[in-house]
Amino acid sequence: RAVTGMSLIEVMVSVLVLGIGLLGIAAMQSMALRGGQSSLESSQVVMATNAIIEAMRANRANAANYNTGGKRCAVTNGTTLAGNDVDNWITSLQASIPGATTCGTIAGCPNACVITVEWDDSRAGADQGGAARTIVTEARI
């Protein structure tokens, strides 16, 4: 009976260790959610890019009209089928990836079309390559 309160100290230390472990689990969950969102956005960009490539293949005779002549971040109310397809592509990109920084470029058509999509992926965090993100796809029409 010479030592009293030792059990209380042991319980306090175990609660501290448990608390640190739970904070680590919460941090890992947060990183997984950010990575999942970044992966979702990348998948949506690839699907939208494949859709515009298929639209170009369907309108092969006018594939040269799909060239954007630079970065497109807004729709231009195209008057041709190619212009409407590009406007729909930009609209779908901006709808699936929120933020005003989502832009697309199409160059090199009708031969080797290079489709570039840029967007802000800052939610992914700097440690996962956040901020500006670019996916470049080359396709032969």
What are these model-predicted stretches?
Residues 2, 6-49:
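Aliphatic-rich helix starts adjacent to a transmembrane/signal segment
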Residues 13, 34-43, 47-141:
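Flexible, low-complexity segments enriched in proline/glycine/serine and punctuated by aromatic residues
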